[in-house]
Amino acid sequence: VATPAMPSMTDAQVAAVKGDWEKIKGSGVEILYFFLNKFPGNFPMFKKLGNDLAAAKGTAEFKDQADKIIAFLQGVIEKLGSDMGGAKALLNQLGTSHKAMGITKDQFDQFRQALTELLGNLGFGGNIGAWNATVDLMFHVIFNALDGTPV
C-alpha cells in the first residue's frame, strides 16, 4: 500500500467530516466489529479479546478497545482545520506505537475499506470524498511513521 500524498482539505470537507462524526462517534463498538468481521485476520491482533469475535463484541474489553479508537479519531477530527500540528503529533504517535506492534499499511488500509463501506451503509456516502481526504491525511502521517520517517 502506497503512502498517500498529503491532501489539502477544504473548509467544506472539514465541516462535512465533523458533522458526520458527531452522528457516528457513539458507534465505536459497531465500527470495530464491522472492521474485524470484514477482515477477521486482524482479530488475533487484539489478544485480550479472546478467540470468538461474536462473543467478544458484548464484553467490556471490546467496548474499551472501541472507545480507544473513537477517542483517537475524536482527537484527530476535532483538530482538522485548526491544529494540524496537534493532529500530526497524535498520528505520528499512533504510527510509531503500531509499528512496534507489527501493524502494517495493509491492515490500516483494511480499516479504511471497512470504514468507507460502513459510512456508506449508514447513509454518509455523500461525504465519502471528504472522508477519503481525511483518511489520506491520517495515513500520510501514520504511514511515514510506520516507515520510520515521521512528518
Curated annotation (Swiss-Prot):
GO CC annotation terms, alphabetical: extracellular region; hemoglobin complex
InterPro entries in UniProt: Erythrocruorin (IPR002336), Globin (IPR000971), Globin-like_sf (IPR009050), Globin/Proto (IPR012292), Mb-like_M (IPR044399)
A molecular-function term among this protein's GO annotations: oxygen carrier activity
Highest rank taxon of the organism: Eukaryota
Binding positions (heme b): H98
Domain Globin: 8-147
Keywords: Heme, Iron, Metal-binding, Oxygen transport, Transport
Similarity-based family: Belongs to the globin family.
Complex and partners: Monomer.
Note: There are at least 12 different components in Midge globin.
The protein's name: Globin CTT-IIIA
